[in-house]
């Protein structure tokens, strides 16, 4: 069997670095690919920046290459393995670029002003590895994730490395990595690609557009989102290019790490573990969560949880507007939130907690163990989104028998089964949650009210919880799809629709 060497390039991967779903998705995908999905032998190595503290998390790190001439200065490649998973990792080390308190933003929440150079350097390192470095065999496939890695397909193509195929996965089209066009030279973008049919959009360098334009194949993370991004409403200005690449665009849904998110074996729950066949400890998890967050200790309370970035995309503003009326109308309702984001939204949620002491708990920040306990102890998860490429958080919640109340957009259309408006025991069917249309507070309130009516019927509640906990959201099927794509890319003909300029890997602007 031929081994397909694949270099996975990403800005984050759990447990080395994580700010959200991207870190979980990359890590879960790479680990699943190590199990020969579909009988395909995939040898994955992950390339990511050496952020503060990541080197300390690697087993036996050693420097394997030094790279000069990168944007932001010279760097080194440090190879090691993740303890537990055994995942092979290459960290791009340049302390001036990456040794900082946050991954993307500073302590005030502002993006680092040199993020363009930071992630251009990552893409150039990927292109150097594609060329081959002493002691490091070149990959057959380079798999870039989101805008942070999206210059890699352009650079590999421009260097004439046609034997190395590239795959770009779009996790969130809204984040494109756009920067002033005058940075193009410093970022090492070839002159032949500095135009609107290349790496530029509206007179700005656009990392994600470059990746979509030059990658051999493009994927996104759910079937519904793959359809949505071809439309002006969801295409974020790139729908025309995506439609032009339609023959090379396909959905590969994400999965979740079902061993990590497993209420029957979750170390963060202590002795309060449970499963779909015996959910008695879920009530104990609720009591423990109430005590931890300062909520009233009421067994009859319904805990509505929210765990997400506090942004307009995640409809945090809508939740803030909808919650007071819900709390006033349902005296048994409690609200618990973990998240961080826009300062004004954080302040509004703190004010809500002060207005409803004992019924509303707000934890600003991200805490992985607490996130597990939140999903275990809550009854419902509120997950509104104006757009949602996939939606990992509802899947985590469902693993713990917490039913999502979510927007009918993107990946959640594929993963959440709504039993319909007339919720009786006989028609709970395969329902696993509740979907709503619209982005007004009234839309969200009506959906939560419908969910509360369902939970008031123990037979319906328990049936839906079992359905949710037993749904298969593992990486098995998705890993098989990626392995098949890699095999097709590695054995297929060269893609010929983009003319390859004869250019050095790092072109000079002069």
UniProtKB/Swiss-Prot annotation:
<dbReference type="GO" id="GO:0004373">
    <property type="term" value="F:alpha-1,4-glucan glucosyltransferase (UDP-glucose donor) activity"/>
</dbReference>
<dbReference type="Pfam" id="PF00534">
    <property type="entry name" value="Glycos_transf_1"/>
</dbReference>
<keyword id="KW-0328">Glycosyltransferase</keyword>
<comment type="similarity">
    <text>Belongs to the glycosyltransferase 1 family. Bacterial/plant glycogen synthase subfamily.</text>
</comment>
<keyword id="KW-0808">Transferase</keyword>
<dbReference type="GO" id="GO:0009011">
    <property type="term" value="F:alpha-1,4-glucan glucosyltransferase (ADP-glucose donor) activity"/>
</dbReference>
<keyword id="KW-0320">Glycogen biosynthesis</keyword>
<feature type="binding site">
    <location>
        <position position="18"/>
    </location>
    <ligand>
        <name>ADP-alpha-D-glucose</name>
    </ligand>
</feature>
<dbReference type="Pfam" id="PF08323">
    <property type="entry name" value="Glyco_transf_5"/>
</dbReference>
<protein>
    <recommendedName>
        <fullName>Glycogen synthase</fullName>
        <ecNumber>2.4.1.21</ecNumber>
    </recommendedName>
</protein>
<dbReference type="GO" id="GO:0005978">
    <property type="term" value="P:glycogen biosynthetic process"/>
</dbReference>
<dbReference type="InterPro" id="IPR001296">
    <property type="entry name" value="Glyco_trans_1"/>
</dbReference>
<comment type="function">
    <text>Synthesizes alpha-1,4-glucan chains using ADP-glucose.</text>
</comment>
<dbReference type="InterPro" id="IPR013534">
    <property type="entry name" value="Starch_synth_cat_dom"/>
</dbReference>
<dbReference type="InterPro" id="IPR011835">
    <property type="entry name" value="GS/SS"/>
</dbReference>
<comment type="pathway">
    <text>Glycan biosynthesis; glycogen biosynthesis.</text>
</comment>
